[in-house]
């Protein structure tokens, strides 16, 4: 049997999972991964910084010029947007896709780190960059295109389908992280199969974990969001672990 057939069969035969158990296990796992989750946010901010500078620095310059005049003037903004060339817009679009692909790869590395910490294995910061290899970038770029395409179609269908698509899309990166040898279409297929099977459970956990991460982060003077933001990945990781599992178990330590 092919690998994708085995994965789909595991999803079909998946046992019921308990919301409370997954949520409490997510909190326990987060206690092991919070530092790596913080590093993930820092790396993501660093990667996105060039795009932020390109987009916002001109706007900041316009606002500073307005402050010198002492009164609001909409003309500079209108002139700025009117003067944006098609090449500049295309550059922004390409940059967004390129940087989003890099962010996607970083997240895949974080999922591998999460698994290692879950099984009490040693990790290092270099594990974030495990997928920073040329033969992975083409696939991750195609997965990004597929994700964006599905999201756009869902939004065009009066927004309601985006709530359905949210769950399957949240599994795409994870299935890639643990099955990078699968084709793009097989990864998307497995993600939607798993998302459909555990939709209500996963949707509830994603919403609750997102709210909890934001509330706790704001209580910690907003900077805490950098530490808590990655918590949202833990419930979906545990669903994947319980339904599909991993090819190799926690290695047994050999004492010489």
Roles of regions detected by a PLM:
Residues 2-4, 10-119:
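Short, small/hydrophobic-residue-rich motifs at membrane-helix boundaries and re-entrant hairpins
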Residues 2-10, 85-119, 151-186, 217-248:
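Selective recognition of hydrophobic, aromatic-rich stretches within alpha-helical transmembrane segments
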Residues 16-47, 122-153, 169-217, 255-256:
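Interfacial aromatic "cap" segments that immediately flank transmembrane helices
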Residues 56-65, 119-125, 129-134, 233-240:
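Repeat-unit-sized solenoid/scaffold elements
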Residues 57-62, 159-162, 206-210, 222-226:
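Juxtamembrane/interface motifs at transmembrane-helix termini
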Residues 75-80, 90-94, 136-139, 152-156, ...:
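Short acidic/polar alpha-helix capping motifs at helix-coil junctions
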Residues 246-256:
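Short, charged juxtamembrane terminal tails flanking transmembrane helices
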């Amino acid at each position: 049997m092919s690998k994708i057939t085995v994965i789909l069969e595991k999803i079909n035969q998946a046992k019921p999972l308990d919301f409370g158990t997954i949520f409490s296990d997510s909190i326990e796992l987060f206690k092991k991964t919070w530092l790596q989750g913080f590093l993930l946010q820092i790396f993501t901010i660093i990667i996105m910084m060039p795009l932020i500078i390109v987009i916002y620095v001109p706007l900041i310059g316009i606002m500073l010029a307005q402050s010198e005049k002492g009164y609001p003037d909409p003309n500079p903004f209108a002139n700025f947007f009117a003067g944006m060339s098609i090449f500049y817009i295309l550059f922004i679009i390409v940059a967004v896709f390129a940087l989003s692909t890099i962010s996607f790869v970083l997240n895949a590395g974080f999922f591998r780190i999460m698994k290692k910490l879950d099984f009490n294995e040693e990790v290092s910061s270099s594990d974030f960059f495990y997928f920073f290899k040329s033969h992975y970038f083409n696939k991750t770029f195609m997965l990004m295109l597929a994700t964006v395409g599905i999201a756009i179609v869902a939004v065009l269908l009066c927004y309601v389908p985006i709530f359905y698509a949210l769950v399957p899309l949240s599994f795409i990166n994870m299935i890639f992280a643990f099955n990078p040898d699968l084709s793009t279409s097989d990864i998307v297929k497995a993600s939607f199969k798993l998302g459909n099977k555990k939709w209500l459970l996963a949707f509830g956990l994603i919403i609750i974990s997102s709210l909890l991460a934001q509330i706790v982060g704001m209580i910690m003077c907003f900077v805490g969001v950098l530490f808590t933001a990655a918590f949202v990945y833990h419930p979906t990781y545990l669903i994947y672990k319980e339904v599909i599992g991993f090819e190799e178990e926690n290695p047994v330590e050999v004492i010489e």
